[in-house]
């Protein structure tokens, strides 16, 4: 059985303690669930959501109920830290492939502003190494010889792409408004990013570091989710799918180098399905740090022209548990604009040194 993506939505993304501070994770997720399930409420098999910094409980079930889905629709919440939202999509697709169901809403929701935790979780035993993510980015830059100028070059490109995507209305079609909130917080002010990036000072290794606030993503609040169906079910409902799930790969690397984790996952994914980076038209790789994209480009031989073509987290921010679902949401809309594309990949790395990658065939 084939799993396909037939719809995708996200909220705006807001800075931590910014526009979306009053919203709990379920407040962010419920409007998306409501939008994706319209006229299909009683056919949804389950809601699966990723979340990394929440209050516990079962966010997916809570959000499904808040969205008004029937009491019979269960929910499951996944924590793979930054990979949570992408894992939710992977899990839904795998359930369909296994014949366990025919329709899922899968994604993630995060409110760092409402998190009850003042300290981050541990990702690895101290004996192995459990660096903060910024320090891990510095370790990765040093190990793979990624210079400050390489990181800044990509950061500027990503900011420009995001601004252009906003100005051209591409982000607007992704977004479900939260009341009157329908514009990402990043675009409410104009910043001279071309001047800010080269002037920014290292923040994690102040003596000789290369990772700055300007070539790193900001912590954000937001949600994203997709309507995942069995392909024949979508056809029976008269819905046109855009992406067909082909397969996935998950891998672990040394926890000191999590920004490099997508490299191993993507390499494994492509090898399993006998394709090369040249065969892939679009890559969405989470921009927690510019060094992550630079490493993926360098180690896999992927030109920047194929990666995050409408920008990403460097401008919009990184709502941990939602970011992976936002990657697939962006692929969904970009694939609709590029009917000549054949394959697309979404990938993310997370704390503890875990990489996750999904391969899709473009059907648009």
Curated annotation (Swiss-Prot):
Domain of life of the native organism: Bacteria
Top EC category: transferase
CC per GO annotation: cytoplasm
InterPro entries: Thiolase (IPR002155), Thiolase-like (IPR016039), Thiolase-like_sf_Thiolase (IPR050215), Thiolase_C (IPR020617), Thiolase_CS (IPR020613), Thiolase_N (IPR020616)
Molecular function terms from GO: acetyl-CoA C-acyltransferase activity
PROSITE patterns linked: THIOLASE_2
Protein's job: May be involved in fatty acid metabolism.
Cross-referenced PANTHER family: 3-KETOACYL-COA THIOLASE, PEROXISOMAL, ACETYL-COA C-ACETYLTRANSFERASE YHFS-RELATED
Name of this protein: Putative acetyl-CoA C-acetyltransferase YhfS
Organism from which the protein derives: Bacillus subtilis (strain 168)
């Amino acid at each position: 059985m084939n799993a396909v993506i037939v719809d995708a939505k996200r909220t705006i993304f807001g800075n931590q303690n910014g526009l979306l501070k009053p919203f709990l994770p379920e407040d962010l997720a419920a409007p998306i669930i409501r939008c994706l399930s319209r006229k299909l409420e009683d056919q949804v098999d389950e809601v699966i959501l990723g979340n990394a910094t929440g209050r516990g409980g079962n966010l997916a079930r809570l959000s499904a109920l808040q969205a008004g889905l029937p009491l019979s629709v269960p929910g499951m919440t996944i924590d793979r830290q930054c990979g949570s939202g992408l894992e939710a999509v992977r899990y839904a697709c795998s359930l369909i492939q296994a014949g366990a169901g025919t329709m899922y809403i899968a994604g993630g929701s995060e409110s760092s502003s409402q998190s009850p935790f003042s300290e981050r979780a541990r990702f690895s035993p101290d004996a192995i190494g459990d660096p903060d993510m910024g320090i891990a980015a510095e370790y990765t830059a040093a190990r793979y010889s990624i210079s400050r100028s390489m990181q800044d070059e990509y950061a500027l490109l990503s900011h420009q792409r995001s601004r252009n995507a906003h100005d051209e209305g591409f982000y607007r079609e992704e977004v479900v408004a939260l009341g009157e909130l329908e514009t990402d917080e990043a675009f409410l002010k104009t910043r001279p990013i071309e001047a800010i990036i080269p002037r920014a000072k290292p923040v994690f290794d102040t003596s000789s570091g290369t990772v700055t606030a300007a070539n790193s993503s900001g912590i954000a609040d937001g949600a994203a989710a997709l309507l995942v169906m069995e392909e024949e079910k979508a056809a029976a409902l008269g819905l046109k799918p855009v992406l067909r799930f082909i397969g996935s790969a998950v891998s672990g690397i040394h926890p000191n180098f999590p920004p490099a984790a997508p490299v191993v996952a993507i390499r494994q994914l492509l090898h399993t399905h006998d394709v090369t980076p040249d065969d892939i038209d679009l890559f969405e790789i989470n921009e927690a740090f510019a060094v992550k994209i630079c490493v993926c480009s360098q180690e896999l031989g992927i030109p920047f022209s194929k990666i995050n073509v409408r920008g990403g987290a460097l401008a919009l921010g990184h709502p941990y548990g939602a970011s992976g679902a936002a990657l697939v949401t962006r692929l969904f809309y970009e694939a609709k604009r590029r009917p000549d594309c054949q394959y697309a990949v979404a990938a993310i790395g997370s704390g503890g040194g875990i990489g996750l990658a999904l391969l899709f065939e473009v059907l648009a």
